[in-house]
């Protein structure tokens, strides 16, 4: 038989193999912005491997256009919010968060909680729009999906998985205070050495820092139980027709894929159904556009600085823009600044403004000396991967924590956006560029990031395919999910043992008293005789 016919027969056999069930059907509960960027990377790889991916998105979704061609199937459900209204809400809340005064703990975190509640109200509205859409639910039911994939910071996917009786995989960066991870996933975060996310603490805490960390833990737990849990518990109970809780339904997730890594996160215990996939977007740099490459090359030995505060920040105040531009004009490096606004008056000849930059490709360029970042996790992972020291100017959410982690690792200098001066920014840049320790530290993190037996993306895809092949991963799910809080902490056992000890002590005391009574009675009787 010729090689040609052998190849054709082999291809036919492979096609039969793939069509006979090796490829699965994935239902995705969509998220927005950076949450979607990471999810999309996983989904595109699943499609490359022959899986069918259906993304469930609202008609208000900012990132989805059903008219655009894509390998992903987009199932749009109607909602009363418009795209413009939804985008305005998000931008307003993020602006509010980034401008919150940090003078007092209670004021700062109470307002953060209000912001999270606002997003929670939108999430529950979208979820109601889906489950009340009988036509859509019937269509999804008949599609016979093999797994649901979602970011739990936007709840609802677990309800769909429960209704359709299919496995659930989460992909998550974090939730405020780790409340979902702890109360729903059973994660272990001992407050004695694991700082709460958004606390900006390290794992080397003083006594007062541990007190502060414990206050954070209690605060987030209280707010979660007070509001988030109750509204979702009630809604899920109504839909399922039985009493249930968000913790119970979320706790049924088969696998939790956490977008973190040990060169970024502080060490803490992990459960068997949890894996780290931090650095999904990290990849070798591609060639730059011609004009940009020429500008980078013109920097000579001084190199370039890459500057971006992310896609969420627009219309920077003129005063802040001029402070930054003035600082950048003081350094010998050329600067590529992602900036969407009016050109600052103090902009130097060494700085070019771009509405968009190929961030990963610039960070991977050999002439890049430093990265000025808002502290988004994706950007930090790319900087780590390419070994670029950072100047962090965090704005909101986990960004202060991320920069604090890099500062602890000796890979970044942190500044405050609202109070920094031109001199502060210029000195910070000179420090990370000229002090070799920053480069050495970030290169160490880079070597750790690259030295993995399996790439984060391949691990993520493996676990999703694993769940599809085995119809779940319940063998990895800890029995802790089936225990009440007092059983989990063995309070019933401790109470029983204390009762036993108390009973034994009581019996011994009674025996001693009886013997003493007998002895004294016998003594009195002897005297009377």
Swiss-Prot record:
Glycans are attached at residues 67-68. It catalyses: glucuronate acceptor + UDP-alpha-D-glucuronate = acceptor beta-D-glucuronoside + UDP + H(+). Its main location: membrane. It is a single-pass membrane protein. GO terms for molecular function: glucuronosyltransferase activity. GO terms for cellular component: endoplasmic reticulum membrane. Keywords: Endoplasmic reticulum, Glycoprotein, Glycosyltransferase, Membrane, Microsome, Signal, Transferase, Transmembrane, Transmembrane helix. It is found in: Microsome membrane; Endoplasmic reticulum membrane. The keyword Phosphoprotein does not apply. It is an enzyme of class 2 (transferase). Its EC number is 2.4.1.17. The chain crosses the membrane at residues 494-514. Residues 1-24 form the signal peptide. The keyword Transferase applies. Belongs to the UDP-glycosyltransferase family. PANTHER family: EG:EG0003.4 PROTEIN-RELATED, UDP-GLUCURONOSYLTRANSFERASE 2B33. UDPGTs are of major importance in the conjugation and subsequent elimination of potentially toxic xenobiotics and endogenous compounds. This isozyme has glucuronidating capacity on estriol and does not catalyze the glucuronidation of beta-estradiol. Capable of conjugating 4-hydroxyestrone, androsterone, diclofenac, and hyodeoxycholic acid. This is UDP-glucuronosyltransferase 2B33.
């Amino acid at each position: 038989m010729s090689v040609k016919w052998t190849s054709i027969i082999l291809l036919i056999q492979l096609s039969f193999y793939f069509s006979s069930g090796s490829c699965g059907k994935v239902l995705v509960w969509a998220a927005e912005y950076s949450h979607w960027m990471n999810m999309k990377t996983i989904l595109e790889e699943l499609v490359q491997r022959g899986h069918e991916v259906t993304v469930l998105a609202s008609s208000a979704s900012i990132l989805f256009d059903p008219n655009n061609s894509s390998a992903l199937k987009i199932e749009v459900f109607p909602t009363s919010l418009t795209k413009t209204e939804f985008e305005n809400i998000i931008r307003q809340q993020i602006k509010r968060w980034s401008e919150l005064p940090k003078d007092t703990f209670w004021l700062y975190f109470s307002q953060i909680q209000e912001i999270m509640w606002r997003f929670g109200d939108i999430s529950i509205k979208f979820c109601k729009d889906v489950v009340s859409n009988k036509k859509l639910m019937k269509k999804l039911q008949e599609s016979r999906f093999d797994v649901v994939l979602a970011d739990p910071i936007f709840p609802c996917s677990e309800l769909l998985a429960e209704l359709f009786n299919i496995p659930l995989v989460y992909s998550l960066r974090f939730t405020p205070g780790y409340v979902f991870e702890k109360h729903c996933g059973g994660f272990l975060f001992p407050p004695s050495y694991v700082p709460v996310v958004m606390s900006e603490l390290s794992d080397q805490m003083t006594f007062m820092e541990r007190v502060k960390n414990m206050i954070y833990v209690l605060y987030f737990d209280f707010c979660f139980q007070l509001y988030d849990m109750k509204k979702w518990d009630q809604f899920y109970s109504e839909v399922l027709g039985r009493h249930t809780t968000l913790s119970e339904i979320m706790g049924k997730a088969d696998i939790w894929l956490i977008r973190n890594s040990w060169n970024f996160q502080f060490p803490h215990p992990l459960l068997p159904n949890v894996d780290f996939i931090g650095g999904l977007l990290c990849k070798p740099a591609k060639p730059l556009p011609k004009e940009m490459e020429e500008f980078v090359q013109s920097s000579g030995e001084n190199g370039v600085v890459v500057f971006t505060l992310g896609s969420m920040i627009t219309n920077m105040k003129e005063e802040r823009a001029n402070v930054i531009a003035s600082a950048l004009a003081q350094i010998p490096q050329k600067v590529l600044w992602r900036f969407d606004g009016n050109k600052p008056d103090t902009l130097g000849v060494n700085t070019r403004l771009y509405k968009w930059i190929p961030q990963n490709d610039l960070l991977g360029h050999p002439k890049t000396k430093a990265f000025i970042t808002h502290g988004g996790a994706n950007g930090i992972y790319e900087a780590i991967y390419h070994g670029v020291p950072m100047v962090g100017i965090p704005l909101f959410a986990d960004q202060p924590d991320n920069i604090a982690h890099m500062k602890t690792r000796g890979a970044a200098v942190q500044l405050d956006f609202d109070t920094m001066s031109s001199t502060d920014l210029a000195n910070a840049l000179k420090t990370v560029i000229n002090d070799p320790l920053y480069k050495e530290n970030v290169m160490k993190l880079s070597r750790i990031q690259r030295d993995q037996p399996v790439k984060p993306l391949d691990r993520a895809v493996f676990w999703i395919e694993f769940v599809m092949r085995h119809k779940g991963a319940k063998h990895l799910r800890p029995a802790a999910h089936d225990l009440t809080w007092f059983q989990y902490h063995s309070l019933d056992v401790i109470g029983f043992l204390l009762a036993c000890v108390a009973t034994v002590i009581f019996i011994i005391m009674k025996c001693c008293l009886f013997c003493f009574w007998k002895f004294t009675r016998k003594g009195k009787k002897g005297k009377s005789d």
